[in-house]
Amino acid sequence: MATLALSVAGQFAGALVGGPFGATMGRALGALAGSVVDGWLFGDKPEAPAFDIRLGSSAEGAPIPRLYGWGRLAGNIIWARELERLGGETAGAKGFGGGEEEEEIGASFAIGFCEGRVARLGRIWADGQLLDTRGLTLRFYHGDEDQLPDSLIEATQGPGNAPAYRGLCYLVVENLPLRRFGNRIPQISAELCRVVGELEPSIRAVTVIPGATEFGYDPTPRLRLVGPGQGVSENAHLAAGTSDWTVSIDELQDLCPALEHVALVVSWFGDDLRCAQCAVSPRVEAAARTVEGTSWSVAGLSRGQVPVVSTHAGGPAYGGTPSDASVLAAIADLKARGLRVTLYPLMLMDVPAGNGLPDPHGGAEQGSYPWRGRITCHPAPGRPGSPDRTGAAAAQIAAFLPGYRAMVLHYAHLAAAAGGVDALLIGSEMVGLTTVRGAANGFPFVDALVALAAEVRAIVGPATKLTYAADWSEYSGCQPAGEKFFHLDPLWASPHIDAVGIDCYMPLADWRDGDGHLDAALSASGHDLGYLGGNIAGGEGFDWFYADPADRQAQRRTPIADGAHGEPWIWRYKDLAAFWSRPHHDRPGGVRAPTPTAWVPGSKPLWLTELGCGAVDKGANQPNIFGDDKSTEGGRPHFSSGLPDGLIQRQLLRAHHRHWRDPANNPPGMLDPERIYCWTWDARPYPAFPALGEAWADGPNHRTGHWLTGRLGAMAGDELLAAIARDWGVELAAEAGAPLVGGYVVAGPARARDAI
């Protein structure tokens, strides 16, 4: 009786002090006190469970923080239900009786974090330890202004009595077992991201890598068996019981609300820069490996039927080719998320150091792990004895084609097996092959791509868009020794090709340290959006060029001109508008051909099949450069210190998106703004990648690399200031981009001036 009486009294008193939350807590405390009185009066009931409950605390009237970007925030209990028994077990020996019954007690409560809208709930900590959320019932509310009351809160409080906590980001935890927390509600904190910058909502397409990952694209968590009764996670390194793919793609969609397209990169491997000797095939990390519930297979080949990747620094130089089953599962998952899939076959070169292979470019041996764009005839064009411009060059390319065609046609069939994809690329950046000439100034590899496009079209049907991702130095033609050939025009004009694909890594800066360089007169900072945006259709590659490295060092700039025919645009790789809108006339031997090529001006849109920049000092000077110690291609941009700089990466992407959204720069039908594919997002979730060196060897490259993983959600300084101003309802003109801010919290009520 005392239990009932005191619980009612406690509920009434608590309601006077703390409203609905106080009533709930008062009732729980009253019930506990009443049970003690009942024990004094009537004695303990021997069948009653024994437990000791300590209730967590909640700060009434605590200030609500405002979050900008990423932050780990401690929660405040805003609602709680009475504790519940979840079932009991006996502590004594099984079957012998006499054991003391220990019941598990569960708590249902809501934790408020900050003002919304919060895009992403990441990891959760309880009492400072990562919380394993498997088996828990959690519901996250982003803090939308139109969010509805939680179903549990409404069921407990009654219809119409449950607050929706609109504008508040909060988490509902249902029946959390408390024994492991000392029979109390633990202190909860969470990793959150409130996106406030302009970049993330601008991103509508992105590439997903690593491309070389046997099961990394599998949405199902997999266990690799390493011994009798022993296993290690194959593809779940951050959230227990959830695949890396699921965690990573969830975060990508949370951070980029306008995302429509994902280009899924899948890699086969070449083993020689001499095209006639280059075998193209899928590869694996190890010749023997057992993964529970699945097995590796690509194009009907099993693990034991394909080469193993080379080793570097004591481990595999690459991951293996994605298993076909994992690619099909990834495509299905992306479609289920409402995303459109571009399938992106991409060659990697597995040529280790000390290979001893003759170098078509004249080196002592082929460089280690080179770029696929260096595959060419042997010797390369311009080298003594080169077969370029002869039938022998065409014969060398013909020897390369079977393996290459097998890769592309396999993924065409895989796309069809997946029920179709939105788009498929038939290659990328094969510039060393597309520019090789056969007899009579023909381009045999381009002819092969035209034929391949027709074969792929017959497999995938008319609904799948096809293109080739040309290097930024390749898409608009080649110019050997005073000549000009729009060598890819037969491909761009093919009825089976739907767009002109460009991997866009054009320089947007010529920045140096100090203020004594030429561009210092244009801007106070190399991060300035106006400066970077002005170089998208200006500066190097549009107005001028450097004839050699000595000129670059001295900043001796040669204007781009065309005195003979008044067509300077044909030499400008940055003049996308002129390339798209005008007829193309080759200039064999420097003489302008009277008849234009097959390209019809304005006939097809341009896609930026890749757009990116390394997160490195002066990255905009050479956006194509990346750091990789194992590869001879690794390096640092011109005049760069090599130090990390995530801001320049962000600013370059912002500048491009601003530029191409402007109709003055992008007339209708020219560059499809939906098809600016940012390079790149990783299926390996941050921070597991890059932190887990035992799982992935390329983690150190993330520090200055092109990854958006681990960087999206941060803010340039002007984005942060603008967001604060919006929240306070004031206008603020902020132009300076620096610094890059990962996260910022305004802890409570403050003036705009103080927050800034």
Residue ranges and their predicted role:
Residues 99-114, 230-257, 310-327, 406, ...:
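Short linear interaction motifs
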Residues 194-199, 246-260, 327-337, 409-418, ...:
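Short amphipathic alpha-helices and their capping/turn segments at secondary-structure boundaries
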Residues 238-249, 320-328, 402-410, 442-454, ...:
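Well-ordered, non-membrane alpha-helical segments in soluble/globular domains
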Residues 219-235, 276-317, 362-397, 515-570, ...:
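A solvent-exposed, charged loop/short amphipathic helix patch at secondary-structure junctions
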Residues 618-722:
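Aromatic-rich peripheral "rim/lid" segments of glycoside hydrolase catalytic domains that contact
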Residues 206-225, 260-441, 452, 459, ...:
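Substrate-binding cleft and catalytic face of glycoside hydrolase catalytic domains
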Residues 389-423, 428-611, 615-624:
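Noncatalytic carbohydrate-binding groove/subsite architecture in carbohydrate-active enzymes
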Residues 2-4, 8, 24, 28-217, ...:
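Polar, S/T/G-rich
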